[in-house]
From Swiss-Prot:
Subunit and interaction comment: Homodimer.
Magnesium is among the record's keywords: yes
Listed Pfam families: Enolase_C (PF00113), Enolase_N (PF03952)
GO cellular component: phosphopyruvate hydratase complex
Keywords carried by this UniProt record: Allergen, Cytoplasm, Glycolysis, Lyase, Magnesium, Metal-binding
Binding site for Mg(2+): 251, 301, 328
Catalytically driven reaction(s): (2R)-2-phosphoglycerate = phosphoenolpyruvate + H2O
Record EC number: 4.2.1.11
Annotated organism of origin: Hevea brasiliensis
Protein name as catalogued: Enolase 1
Major site of localization recorded for this protein: cytoplasm
Cross-referenced InterPro entries: Enolase, Enolase-like_C_sf, Enolase-like_N, Enolase_C, Enolase_CS, Enolase_N
Needed cofactors: Mg(2+)
Family: Belongs to the enolase family.
């Protein structure tokens, strides 16, 4: 007898910020239960698929009872009897038939909510791996047609600014990437050591309260100069003895400080802001170039506003060989926007966030498209996370070569890194760590 889905149930749980989110249980005819939860972001791109929230006063408008109900009443009953290994069939059925809403960028999940559909999509994927009797990462690799499993380079977000932190820093994330490690295990060691050195450097310079952590486990010292953030990382890396082995990445999240006057305000968090730090896209581009000249920066994410395609293309053509230019808000993991960016040479790497697009199948499509264009791919958490570890397996199965899921601090972040340690151990001598090849760990599949 083929194993089929016997029930799909959802519930409201809480993410790492104390906001409601959706968890789904997929039960199979052999008694197996697959469970998955979805995350949510703070700095969200306007082109992301719809995250359905209840509004009203309960949970300050952030309840997800409608999304939960959509799983329990619409999606669940419709999936009973289906084969959990048919990921594409189930995803397309949910997205195109049960939901069916479309905007100019494709299937937008406005009826059922991307959070409802994704919770089920992730749980179905876990169920499919169980039925096949293989690890989740292997099942994902098979779904994508990828033959090479790769452990990603972790990008640890160790200094927080932007919408993630209460300091004056405009740029959202300052990350460290242990590209010189020989294994994921060693990368974790390097990351953790640099993190602790950074903590003592910050404590000494700014005092104990500067070592309080932000949503993703990074520090949020009250600094205003973005360059100061880079300087702190450079110092911590040197103190840990990893100069040349640990490099730097940034997530600017520039859409958060782009104004209607088409300028970028590096002082956007100041209450008595006189506009003295507003700069043009051209000036911001030159600022990045000066950073890259002075610091070992290998990756810059969302350097411009999500609609500022022109400056993206300029920056990519000027420094894209040396530095990865990552589209997050620009692309929102949407295959149609990825296609446009490839055509316009707007960036050269995809940030993969499953909850921006809302299904496993569409996520795989965006990754394959990016890899065929010669781009890099970085799998990513969201700032509001759960203990779910799906993205760890996803990054190995799709050989993304990179993952960012916070600092080596806070259990909802470590859950993913710890899962990657387990996967590396399970693969044994077969384990390959992306290392210096993080931008292109495998040939396109």
């Amino acid at each position: 007898m083929a194993i089929t889905i016997v029930s799909v149930r959802a519930r409201q749980i809480f993410d790492s910020r104390g906001n409601p989110t959706v968890e789904a249980d997929v039960k199979l005819s052999d008694g197996y239960l697959a469970r998955a939860a979805v995350p949510s972001g703070a700095s969200t791109g306007i082109y992301e698929a719809l995250e359905l929230r209840d509004g009203g006063s309960d949970y300050l408008g952030k309840g997800v009872s409608k999304a939960v109900e959509n799983v329990n009443i619409i999606i669940g009953p419709a999936l009973v009897g289906k084969d959990p290994t048919d990921q594409v069939g189930i995803d397309n059925f949910m997205v195109q038939q049960l939901d069916g809403t479309v905007n100019e960028w494709g299937w937008c999940k406005q009826k059922l909510g991307a959070n409802a559909i994704l919770a089920v999509s992730l749980a179905v994927c876990k169920a499919g791996a169980h039925v096949k009797g293989i690890p989740l990462y292997e099942h994902i690799a098979n779904l994508a047609g990828n033959k090479n499993l790769v452990l990603p380079v972790p990008a640890f977000n160790v200094i927080n600014g932007g919408s993630h932190a209460g300091n004056k820093l405009a740029m959202q994330e300052f990350m460290i990437l242990p590209v010189g490690a020989s294994s994921f295990k060693e990368a974790m060691k390097m990351g953790a050591e640099v993190y602790h050195h950074l903590k003592s450097v910050i404590k000494k310079k700014y005092g104990q309260d500067a070592t309080n952590v932000g949503d993703e486990g990074g520090f949020a010292p009250n600094i205003q100069e973005n360059k100061e953030g880079l300087e702190l990382l450079k110092t911590a890396i040197a103190k840990a003895g990893y100069t040349g082995k640990v490099v730097i990445g940034m997530d600017v999240a520039a859409s958060e400080f782009y104004g209607s006057d088409q300028t970028y305000d590096l002082n956007f968090k100041e209450e008595n802001n006189n506009g003295s730090q507003k700069i043009s896209g051209e000036a911001l581009k030159d600022l990045y170039k000066s950073f890259v000249a002075e610091y070992p920066i290998v990756s810059i994410e969302d350097p411009f506003d999500q609609d500022d395609w022109a400056h993206y293309a300029k920056l990519t053509s000027e420094i894209g060989e040396k530095v990865q230019i990552v589209g997050d808000d620009l692309l929102v993991t949407n295959p149609k926007r990825v296609e446009k960016a490839i055509k316009e040479k707007a960036c050269n790497a995809l940030l993969l966030k499953v909850n921006q697009i809302g299904s496993v199948t569409e996520s795989i499509e965006a990754v394959k498209m990016s890899k065929r264009a010669g781009w890099g791919v970085m799998a990513s958490h969201r700032s509001g996370e759960t203990e779910d570890t799906f993205i760890a397996d996803l990054s190995v199965g799709l050989a993304t070569g990179q993952i960012k899921t916070g600092a080596p601090c806070r259990s909802e972040r470590l859950a993913k890194y710890n899962q990657l340690l387990r996967i590396e151990e399970e693969l044994g001598s077969e384990a390959v760590y992306a290392g210096a090849n993080f931008r292109k760990p495998v040939e396109p599949y």
